[in-house]
């Protein structure tokens, strides 16, 4: 009696690709790194999440909306063309999304203070008090390490309506 050999398993032409979660922004195929805190981390079926680039953009958008929700310029009282102005540059990620570091200004006031950094610093020290401003500066200098974007996104929840 002839013994039949077991056939060898067929090899796949292409290895199976393990699908990893991707950023929710249309057209972005980077891995999701930041997830909404309401979702479970590590779950393959995340409903939403962002790559680092889009997490930063979304955090900026939400923070700006929160600051501009005051509805008027804190310099002159105007209600049109409002912008989020930072006392300490957005470059310093340790205080970029700190509410004390921002104020709502119209285009004109924001441009005026951007072009005159000494006046802007004096205004910030006057508005916040010198001690608070110095603490913000120290916090900005001291910060090293990755930003916890999930915490920032949780702090400023999504707002459906844009502010002018």
List the model feature ranges, each with a label.
Residues 61, 65-76:
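Betabetaalpha-Me/HNH-type nuclease active-site subdomain
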Residues 112-119, 129-136:
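Substrate-binding/catalytic groove segments of enzymes
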Residues 48, 54, 85-86, 110, ...:
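Histidine-centered active-site/metal-ligand motif
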Residues 74-104, 113, 119:
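Histidine-centered nuclease catalytic patch
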Residues 1-62, 78-80, 132-164:
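A boundary/linker detector
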Residues 52-57, 92-95, 110:
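Short, surface-exposed loop/turn motifs that are enriched in glycine and acidic residues
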């Amino acid at each position: 009696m002839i013994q039949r050999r077991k056939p060898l398993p067929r090899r796949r032409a292409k290895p199976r690709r393990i699908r990893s979660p991707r950023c929710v922004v249309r057209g972005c195929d980077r891995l999701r790194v930041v997830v909404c805190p309401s979702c479970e981390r590590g779950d393959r079926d995340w409903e939403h999440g962002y790559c680092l680039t889009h997490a930063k953009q979304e955090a900026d958008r939400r923070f700006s909306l929160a600051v501009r929700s005051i509805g008027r310029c804190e310099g002159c009282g105007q209600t049109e063309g409002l912008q989020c102005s930072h006392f300490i540059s957005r470059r310093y990620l340790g205080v970029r999304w700190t509410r004390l570091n921002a104020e709502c200004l119209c285009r004109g006031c924001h441009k005026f203070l951007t072009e005159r950094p000494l006046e802007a610093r004096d205004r910030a020290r006057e508005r916040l008090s010198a001690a608070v401003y110095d603490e913000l500066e120290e916090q900005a200098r001291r910060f090293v390490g990755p930003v916890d974007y999930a915490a920032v996104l949780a702090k400023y929840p999504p707002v459906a309506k844009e502010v002018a």
